[in-house]
Regions:
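Sec-dependent bacterial lipoprotein signal peptides
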Residues: 1-18
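Pocket-flanking alpha-helical
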Residues: 69-100, 206
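Exported/periplasmic ABC-transporter solute-binding proteins
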Residues: 4, 20-58, 68-69, 73-76, ...
């Protein structure tokens, strides 16, 4: 009886060990678990890519959306080694990783745009970048009273601070929240303010954003090269006639063949580029199209 009991105990131990090993999936290019840091202005397109990636492979990617500055800080602090940004790493940031014998790989996968929105009751739907920099510097505008950003450390805030020659957002005439959705809601409820968001929030709106879309206008921006105004449509972003177009990148600093490499390959693949195109953004390579050529021509007219 004792012999059978020992056999049963050993069998149970083996079962537990095997089960535990199976539950701990080792991360590889197309399987395992990882965390992906995302610039909050780019969250919708990344969510769309991750959803399909997880459905195709035995992988789980936890998305953490933060401001651009917070994403970079988390990347440096090793909170995660994979990020989606609207810029490449600076020389200083690259040197930090290279000193640790890690050589980040940057993969471009889409072209996005910064969108400027205003309340539907605002009659003026045209704006120039000079007007934006004037508002950043506290100067008055005939129609708009100020700017609203998602975060003082966001990529959009950083872009306009550099454009205006400022080190940080001014204390007067400029407001900030935590998310793009909050910016859209605020502009929908307040006249005379310009909201600064990622265009993908308009192309791929959540339920809360959809409820406010009929209360806002997306402004057309002057292109100084041809002196014409352009809306942030997919075609205008592709041709860069819309002056606030920008490139998107996957930054992989894992240093090994993990999900960072797999996800970067996926978003730049045929499937990933189709997802980008369908989302309203511009892929770096347009997906191929199959053309069916008929061997005979028939006349359908009677």
């Amino acid at each position: 009886m004792r012999k059978y009991f020992n056999i049963l105990v050993y069998a149970l131990l083996i079962f537990v060990v095997v089960t535990c090993k199976k539950s701990e999936i080792k991360e590889a290019m197309l399987e395992g678990k990882t965390t992906l840091l995302v610039d909050e202005t780019l969250k919708p397109i990344v969510e769309a890519q991750v959803q399909v990636f997880e459905s195709e492979y035995d992988a789980k990617i936890n998305i953490i959306a933060k401001s651009e500055a917070e994403v970079i800080q988390a990347l440096v602090n090793d909170s995660s080694r994979i990020a989606v940004l609207s810029r490449t790493l600076t020389n200083e940031e690259m040197n930090y990783f290279e000193k640790k014998k890690i050589f980040p790989k940057t993969t471009p996968f889409a072209k996005d745009a910064i969108a400027l929105i205003a309340n539907k009751n605002t009659k003026d739907t045209l704006i120039t970048l000079q007007h934006i920099t004037d508002l950043m510097k506290g100067k008055s505008h005939s129609t708009f009273k100020g700017l609203v950003f998602d975060n003082p450390n966001s990529s959009t805030a950083n872009y306009f601070c550099k454009l205006a020659g400022l080190n940080s957002l001014p204390a007067v005439g400029v407001f900030s929240f935590k998310t793009n959705e909050e910016v859209i809601q605020y502009v929908a409820q307040n006249n005379g303010m310009i909201g600064v968001i990622g265009i993908n929030y308009i192309f791929e709106p959540s339920k809360s954003v959809s409820d406010n879309l009929d209360k806002i206008n997306v402004l057309s921006v002057l292109n100084a090269k041809d002196n014409k105004y352009y809306a942030p449509t997919q075609s205008n972003i592709a041709t860069v006639q819309y002056p606030l177009a920008r490139d998107l990148f996957v930054v992989n600093a894992q240093g090994y063949k993990g999900l960072g490499m797999g996800f970067a390959s996926f978003v730049s693949s045929e499937i990933g580029q189709r997802i980008t195109l369908k989302s309203g953004l511009v892929p770096v390579r347009f997906p191929s199209r199959k053309i069916r050529v008929r061997s005979t021509i028939t006349n359908d007219k009677k």
